[in-house]
């Protein structure tokens, strides 16, 4: 072997990475040594997993407690008709194993909760959050921020999506600096009631995967401190700054020390 222990097949598979000065053999080796947890194997999780695996991220975890439904197939592109009724983590694992034998896949067929997230974070360097509910989003933010684990966030509805990255730096910012608490239950529709354009999660999920890859490489400028809003109907991107809040209950000066102080299944309030 040569080129930092990449074998002949890997040199061929990742050749378009390796010829880039910004990546090269050393960068590809960093990707192969990286471990990333993807929360959710649905609309956002599909492109996230697809591109992390193709890039050669060596260890990928998938956390999801759902099964494939036929209504998922319009946007959840790693699953097919034969997968209907199967656990999404199993379908996703098989997709990745067909795509890239270099990747070790760990499946976690469970809903991510305050009882298990800390153990999950211990196993991975980076988190990419493709969850579809506020409770999980706030939990991921709080747990990752307190543990110092960087994560990429994405959300979608109808024609619109949002995406950002939080590098879990001391002093923030974090998701709660922008949105201190979740909206009241029932005030914001979800994809099941309001719908979602089938291609939308592809765009947002690919940006999330890009952020995960850059974090693993240690190259480029992430969206830390910025949130991008994408409107597929108008084909526009807008960006806002996310400023650290000194009074943020998570990353602020007097922030909490444990996720167990939060009522995630209610309002995510602290």
PLM regions and their residue ranges:
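Adenine nucleotide-associated cytosolic modules
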Residues: 2-270
């Amino acid at each position: 072997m040569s080129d930092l222990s990449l074998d002949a097949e890997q040199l061929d598979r990742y050749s378009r990475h390796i010829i880039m000065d910004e990546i090269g053999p050393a960068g590809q080796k960093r990707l192969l040594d990286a471990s990333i947890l993807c929360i959710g194997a649905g609309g956002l999780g599909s492109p996230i997993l697809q591109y992390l695996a193709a890039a050669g991220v060596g260890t990928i975890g998938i956390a999801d407690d759902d099964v494939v439904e036929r209504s998922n197939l319009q946007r959840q592109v790693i699953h097919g008709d034969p997968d209907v009724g199967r656990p999404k983590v199993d379908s996703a694992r098989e997709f990745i194993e067909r795509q890239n034998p270099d990747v070790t896949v760990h499946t976690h067929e469970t809903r991510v909760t305050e009882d298990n997230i800390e153990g999950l974070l211990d196993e991975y360097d980076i988190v990419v959050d493709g969850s579809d509910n506020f409770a999980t989003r706030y939990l991921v933010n709080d747990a990752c921020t307190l543990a110092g684990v960087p994560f990429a966030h994405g959300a979608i509805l109808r024609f619109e999506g949002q995406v950002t990255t939080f590098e879990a730096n001391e002093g923030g910012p974090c998701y709660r600096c922008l949105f201190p608490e979740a909206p009241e239950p029932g005030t914001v529709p979800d994809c099941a009631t309001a719908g979602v354009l089938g291609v939308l999660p592809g765009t947002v999920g690919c940006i999330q995967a890009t952020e995960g890859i850059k974090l693993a490489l240690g190259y480029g400028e992430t969206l830390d401190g910025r949130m991008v809003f994408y409107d597929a109907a108008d084909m526009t991107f807008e960006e806002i700054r996310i400023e650290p809040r000194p009074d943020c209950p998570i990353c602020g000066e007097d922030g909490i020390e444990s996720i167990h102080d939060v009522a995630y299944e209610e309002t995510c309030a602290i």
